Amino acid sequence: MITSRETVLNPLAHRWAVLIGTARAYFVILNTYAIQRIRNPITLTINFATWRIAYGLTGHHQIAGASVSGFLLIGSFGNIIWFSTLWSSGFAIERARHEGTSAALFLSPASRPMVIVGYGLGALAMATPAFFVVAVVAVLSGAHFYLVDPLAAFLAFAGLVAGTLACGFALAGIFILSRRGNIIATLLQMPIYFLAGFVVPISRLPVWVQPFSNALPVTHAAIALRETALLGYTTAQAGPQILACFGVAAVYCIVGYFSLRRVEHVAKYAGQLDLY
C-alpha cells in the first residue's frame, strides 16, 4: 500500500498503483459472472466465422496479399481491443456518474487518466481468452503467417493497444460532455469495422472515407501488424505506419486531456460533480 508520504515523494509510483488497482478491480467485476467469461470468445468467434464464410463464398483466397483468415485474424484482434476499450475506458467517467461515485473519482487524489486507462487494461485482461480462441479458429481455417521481424510485430501490436486506449481516453470526456455517450458509443461499434480496416482493406473503401480511416490510430496499427505478421515486413518497412499510429494516438491523448479538464472545470464551476 502507498502511504500519503510516498504519494508525495513518488508520484509515479502512485499513478502506477492507481492504474494497476483500477485494472485489477475492474477485471474482478467483469469476472463475477460466468457469462462474462464466455461472451467475448463466442461473440468474436462468430464474427470471425461470418466474415470468413462470406469471403469464402465470394471466392476470395487472399486479401491485400495475405490469407483471408490471417487478414481477418488481425482485424479480430483489433475488434477485440476496440470493443473492450470503448465500453471500459470510454465509459469510465460515465459509469462513475451512473453509479453515483463521480464525487469520489473527482475529489480523490487518484490520477483520473490512470483510472480511465486502468478500466481499459482490466477489460483487455478479461478479453485475453478471446484472443486465443479466435487465433485457433483462424489457424484451423487456413491463416498463414510470415514473420521476419518479431520486434516490428511487437511494436505494431503495442501500437494497436496504445491506439485503442488513447481513443478510449479521448472518448471518456467527450461522452460526458456530449450528454449522449451511450448513443455515440453504439453508433461507433459497426462503422469501426470498416473505417479501421478490420474486415476490408482501407484501399477498397471510397476515397472520401479514407481520410476518416487515417484519422484513427488503430487503422495504422492494424495495417502495420498485418504487414509484419503476415507479409514479412521489417521494422524499417512498417515503421511509417507504426509511427503514424503513435502520432495519431498522441493527438487523441491531447484531446482526452483537454476534454477531461473541461469536465472538471465545468463541474467545479457549477459546484457539483453530477452536472452531466
Question: Language-model segments: which ranges?
Answer:
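Hydrophobic transmembrane alpha-helices and immediately adjacent juxtamembrane helices
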Residues: M1-Y276
